[in-house]
Amino acid sequence: VVQQITTTSSTTTIQSILQKQYPINCSSSSSYNNGDGWSCENLYDGDPSSWQDNSLQCQDGWVEFSFSQELYIEFLVFQNVEDSKSFSRNFKARDILITTTDSEFLLNKELENDNTSQWIDINATTSYLKIDILSADPGEEVSGSQPFEECAIQEITFYGRG
């Protein structure tokens, strides 16, 4: 999806194209194995690796992202673990709260308990975004394998202009 907006001012024409926006860094409430292989950087690396909390079942979990400058985030795509066995066995975020540098911006969202991409409209200008996990769907036993205690998110992709 590519959209183009042209804004004309008295002296210049500015084009802003909707595109993927990448954080310059992130932090999280915790990471499994001290982040070795499971850190929040996995959330925007474009591959199937995931962020996992430190066996806390999503309780009091959060991830936050910083961008190099203020930008307009139109939406984000939230991706639970795609692999069906891992998806079933891990805890998954259900209710989330999204906040930004704007103290007036609060977005509550209930996520679906599935492993498909979920689009969340943001429509805010910010250099920082935080996702608090308010509740979770538990992991389940799969073919005799016990559920995991970790909260897992595979990818969060930001789309915006800036």
How should these model regions be labeled?
Residues 1-13:
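Extracellular mucin-like PTS domains
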Residues 4-5, 16, 53, 162:
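Positively charged, low-complexity intrinsically disordered regions
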Residues 13-26:
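Extracellular carbohydrate-recognition regions
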Residues 32-106, 114-162:
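Aromatic, loop-rich ligand-recognition surfaces of beta-strand-rich domains
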